[in-house]
Amino acid sequence: MSSVFHEHTQFVNVTEIDDLIQDILNTPIHYNVLSLFSGAGGMDYGFKGGFQLFNQEYSQNPINLRYANDIFLQATQIYKDNFDIDHDVDTTNINEIDLEEIDQKYGFIPNTRNENQNNPNGIDIILGGFPCQTFSIAGKRAGLNDERGQLYLQMSRFIQHYQPKVFVAENVDGIRNTRNNNLENVNATALEIIMNHFNEIGYNVQYNVLDAADYGVPQSRRRVIIVGVRSDLGRNIDISYPSPTHATTPRTAFDGLEDIWNLFNTNQIPNHNWNN
């Protein structure tokens, strides 16, 4: 299972989200998922389920991964290795994607909001971890004033086009503290601006901060998880997030690599140092 691990991998217990979606859909069908900024597919893998991790079984969720996009070619190659999909991962720059062309190529039906039943070619869920460099403490923290910091608007473009019932986005914890005084003359944090935007396009939104280290990942990765549910569905979001499993006993890098450690000649692995 080690091949599925990548620096962008997020392990997400989506039981509560799955129950919420199932209640909204009210029919035992597969959910069509559209993935943006997909990387190696860590968030998608958590939604898909069907694997065992730290002696805990994660059941297979009834989803169809209908489309994924990432501009980083190497990551998309790993994505294809991680998932059994019958289509290529789109490597087009998301700023240049023509949604009507996507509909035509993949057979998607946009905006199924007013249909009484679920359309098999509609998009039920959109996932996306829009780029975080401009919000990270490791960067210059230009926030939304940087072009990369406004890529959430591209995710919004997809959401407004397809009107999914649910979307889930993630970003670094720094998004809560990065202020953008020069953008729209609003003195607010990037997260406040983004949450307000998703609310204005018709979604009830909620966020929480989770640290991957608390759930057994041998790395401290605090991430803001944003969940949006389409407001016309008449549902407030009340998700019970999973309790930490490793808050007091974090796993080390050796723990995480233990199952593959003997496959390498460790004398040939160079030491890695991080510099700001």
Residue positions per predicted region:
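N-terminal Rossmann-like NAD(P) cofactor-binding module of classical short-chain dehydrogenase/reductase
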Residues: 124-127, 168
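Conserved acidic residues
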Residues: 72, 90-98, 209-213
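Class I S-adenosyl-L-methionine
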Residues: 105-120, 132-276
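Conserved short alpha-helix immediately C-terminal to the canonical SAM/SAH-binding motif I
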Residues: 74-78, 151
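Conserved acidic E/D residue at the C-terminus of a beta-strand in Rossmann-like folds
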Residues: 67-73, 170-174
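S-adenosyl-L-methionine
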Residues: 77-114
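S-adenosyl-L-methionine-dependent DNA methyltransferase catalytic core
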Residues: 1-65, 197-200, 223-276
